[in-house]
Curated annotation (Swiss-Prot):
Required co-factors: [4Fe-4S] cluster
Assigned EC number: 2.8.4.4
PANTHER family in alphabetical order: RIBOSOMAL PROTEIN S12 METHYLTHIOTRANSFERASE RIMO, RIBOSOMAL PROTEIN US12 METHYLTHIOTRANSFERASE RIMO
One Pfam family, short name: Radical_SAM
Organism field: Nitratiruptor sp. (strain SB155-2)
Catalysed reactions, semicolon-separated: L-aspartate(89)-[ribosomal protein uS12]-hydrogen + (sulfur carrier)-SH + AH2 + 2 S-adenosyl-L-methionine = 3-methylsulfanyl-L-aspartate(89)-[ribosomal protein uS12]-hydrogen + (sulfur carrier)-H + 5'-deoxyadenosine + L-methionine + A + S-adenosyl-L-homocysteine + 2 H(+)
Protein's name in the database: Ribosomal protein uS12 methylthiotransferase RimO
SUPFAM superfamilies xrefs: Radical SAM enzymes
């Protein structure tokens, strides 16, 4: 009887890529969704901000309480790396600890039943992965680590400096995936617009875009995590003019007040940030996503109102909102002028109302239109509905199109279809597949 593995990948999609590398190292295990029957349980943790850390710990404790006797519980990833000394002392529930350096050695650690924290942060090169969750879409990691010095962010302390993958490695990985039927790709990293700057080469994202365009069999691609100070008009133009990359721009701006951007050590002011955003918005059929932090130390009422005014004037398609999380080891942690939690909550509520309104407006732009959608399968909303994703959207984060009728028989998961959008139901669109 084959051994069974239950795996949980928390946090970002970059973490998911590393989880998929671990899965490929454990071919003798059969995946199970039921932790109680697993011989091996792996949790790839997130250590980014307070709520993510709490979720990681809670997941490990919950799985420990449900595991069967003689099973092995592994805690891997960012949280494990960031607090390796404390966790190993305080969590006897865990059998094997490993951080962000040993994903490709997970089979060895399990067979030897030993913990390991390599000094070097792991970056995928040509290793096999078992893609999860899709038969047509895959995430591609551009780089690991980050050279930015944002005041609020602890990631460089456990993910290290920027290390980029060579273009030829990325191209080969995509070719291998295309040969297996994958056709839609999302490129991820901590800072995608700094790709290959660790080799002293600027604007290499443009070279990557052109290299990917040469690969036969790709239907679509998009890039996440552009950093404002390293994003250039040339990059925007390369995406806008690409036959493969959709006009998708995800650039976390975090704030728009000059004084706050300076406190956050973002390396760019409001004017240049706005110039980039307006250039992105000027691209036909562009889709803009950003992230904002509310309540960073020193955020005055004036700073906040400036952000509110900008958001009401410049409409994003999607916005991730984060309450400031006070992370030890960061520059912001040492700052005075901390914002009271109740003020942060009030400001979050104001922004959340704007975000929801803008998302509905963005969705309603498609009412009455026929759009290209990937078919993802049966919707979780109802077994009578199919689930689609607009071609330009990133998976999981940008939304779902509920398909309630089709002029075509025998629809295939992973295929692109023309879907006529009939209505909006809450935060979802409803449409019909057209012949």
């Amino acid at each position: 009887m084959s051994k069974k593995l239950h795996v949980v990948s928390l946090g970002c999609t970059k973490n998911l890529v590393d989880t998929e590398v671990m899965l490929a190292r454990l071919p003798e295990y059969e995946i199970t969704q039921i932790p109680e029957e697993a011989d091996l349980i792996i949790v790839n943790t997130c250590g980014f901000i307070g709520p993510a850390k709490e979720e990681s710990l809670q997941t490990v404790f919950d799985l420990h309480s449900r595991r069967k006797k003689d099973s092995t519980l592994v805690m891997a990833g960012c949280l494990s790396e960031r607090y390796k000394e404390e966790l190993q002392k305080e969590m006897p529930e865990v059998d094997i600890f490993t951080g962000v350096g040993d994903y490709a050695k997970i089979d060895e650690l399990i067979s030897q039943k030993k913990s390991s924290f390599s000094d070097q942060v792991y970056l995928i090169r040509s290793e096999e992965r078992i893609i999860t969750g899709s038969n047509y879409h895959a995430y591609i990691k551009l780089s690991e680590g980050c050279n930015q010095q944002c005041s609020f962010c602890a990631i460089p302390s456990f993910k290290g400096k920027l290390q980029s993958r060579p273009i030829e490695d990325i191209v080969q990985e995509i070719k291998n995936l295309v040969a297996k039927g994958y056709k839609d790709f999302t490129f991820v990293s901590q800072d995608s617009s700094s790709y290959l700057r660790d080799f002293g080469i600027q604007e290499s994202l443009v070279d990557l875009i052109h290299a990917v365009e040469e690969i036969e069999g790709i239907m679509s691609a998009r890039i996440l995590y552009l950093y404002p100070s390293t994003t250039t008009p040339k990059m925007i133009d390369a995406i806008a003019n690409s036959p493969v990359f959709v006009n998708y721009f995800e650039m976390p701006i975090q704030h728009i007040s000059d004084s706050l951007l300076k406190k956050m050590k973002r390396g760019i002011g409001a004017q240049k940030t706005k110039e980039l955003l307006y250039a992105m918005r000027a691209v036909p059929e562009s889709f803009l996503r950003t992230s904002l932090i509310v309540g960073h130390p020193g955020e005055s009422e004036e700073d906040f109102h400036e952000l509110v005014e900008f958001l009401e004037d410049f409409e994003f398609d999607r916005i991730n909102l984060f309450a400031y999380s006070d992370e030890e080891g960061t520059k912001a942690y040492e700052m005075e002028e901390k914002i009271p939690q109740e003020v942060i909550e009030e400001r979050l509520a104001i922004l959340d109302a704007i975000v929801k309104k803008q998302q509905m407006k963005s969705l309603e732009k498609d009412l009455g239109k026929t759009v290209e959608c990937y078919l993802d399968g049966t919707s979780e909303e109802s077994e009578l509905l199919l689930s689609g994703r607009k071609k330009i959207w990133a998976p999981e984060v940008d939304g779902e199109i509920l398909i309630n009728d089709s002029e075509i028989d025998n629809l295939q998961i992973g295929n692109l279809y023309k879907v006529h959008i009939n209505e909006r139901l809450g935060d979802k669109l409803v449409g019909t597949v057209r012949a």
